[in-house]
Amino acid sequence: MGTLHKSGLAEQAPGGTQQERVETRRKADGDTASPPLQPFLRMRNVDVARGEKIVLRRVNLEIAEGEHVAILGPNGCGKSTLIKAITSECYPIVGPGMERLIYGRERWDLMELRKHLGVVSAELPGERTPRTLGIDAVVSGFFSSSTLWPNLEVTAQMRERAEEALARMQASHLRGRWVGEMSAGETRRVMIARALVHRPAMLLLDEPSNALDLAAQRELREILRGVARTAGILMVTHQLADILPEIHRVVMMRDGEIVADGAKGELLTERRLSELFGVEVTLTERNGYWHSW
């Protein structure tokens, strides 16, 4: 496990399934009170086509609920398509030995899946959301809508959950602000709160620092460290600094394939990152965060 090679198939680490390895690590860290982790994602021999082009090839990936994982790779490597395959926005090509299970199921209604998996896109909100108050934008997460339409029935519990999610993101002060008047960093906090209203066991973050200035990036990363105490983090990024100290596993992608999957300390090296991004990389680590130049 953790070897970069041309075939695109990551070697498997000894010691059982990924879920079993995570349980072993939790026990070694002294966590014996938490309930056993459940399987979240299982992919075997997954190919995904967009139009006539196959953009994901032979993907093998297993993630346990509550696990913290970073998917790292250059732009155009297939990360966005992998997200769509995980969130059931697109489905794999059916073939021999192919398997794609989310919580043990092949197919999901997207609104039902959002109760278990919170998804935060790299893009800022669509045209309707900027004319929505912060609290209403968060509540709209219950309906997977761009805003709160008049026909939607909002309960007191939904409002309570929305306030709770804003508080988790240290964004309660944004409840009465128009989303369109917020900074990029403030908007990202509201959108993550929107994904948290269901109290999902897993949170998928696509390029979380996209469009944020340095101060907003730092604030968001520290807030997400708190979220990581109660939910698994699946982070898709090409920025090393996005990888929180709580994330111990890294999956590397290149040219539509997983080329390495292993412990963060084994994969975040200058040699491996230089191979992955095709450019000479110099690394430094500070307070659990890695930076490159």
Which residues does each PLM region occupy?
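Helix-to-loop junction immediately C-terminal to a conserved catalytic motif
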Residues: 87
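Conserved ABC ATPase "signature" region
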Residues: 139, 154-174
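Conserved ABC ATPase signature
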Residues: 151-153, 178-182
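A short, proline-enriched helix->beta-strand linker immediately N-terminal to the Walker B motif
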Residues: 197-201
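Catalytic Walker B motif of ABC-type/P-loop ATPase nucleotide-binding domains
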Residues: 203-207
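ABC ATPase nucleotide-binding domains
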Residues: 271-293
